[in-house]
Structure formats: C-alpha cells, structure tokens
C-alpha cells in the first residue's frame, strides 16, 4: 500500500487547506459512496485533523505536508497504490491507482 501525491497535489493541499499548520495533518479516510472506488460502494476522502487525534496506521511526508491514514481505515487502502493529482480543468483532486 502506498499513497503518492503529485507535486501539483501537494501544492493544492497546501494552498487550499493552509497546510502545514502546527500539529495538523492531511488525513485520508474511507467514506460511503463517491465516484472513484477502490472497493465497491466506498471512496477516499480527506480532512485536516490534529495528529494527536488520529490513531495512525500509515504516514508519509511530502515537502512539509504530513499525510496519514487512520488504523481503522487501512482495510480500504490496503493492496492498492493510490496516486493523487489535481484535475486542472476543474481544480479538484483526482485519484488513480498505479
């Protein structure tokens, strides 16, 4: 399992979510529904949370941006390499598998 962010995605998260900021992390989690689905019926989502509030199961760092997945959400991301980029046409985050 690997989460890879493009340089454009790192810049987008930093600008749109005002990260890095103190002890805050970019957390990816699983939600019900959505367009891009690694497992049927569920899709990835993200939020900004305090690092101390997340039971971290996965962590990576991109140019000062701390990216985490909680232990409880690993089931969704396991066995997948997720590539996160920006769809420039609509200025939104896009997901793909590698």
From Swiss-Prot:
Per the record, the domain of life is: Bacteria
Family classification: Belongs to the HesB/IscA family.
Stated name of the protein: Uncharacterized protein SSP1406
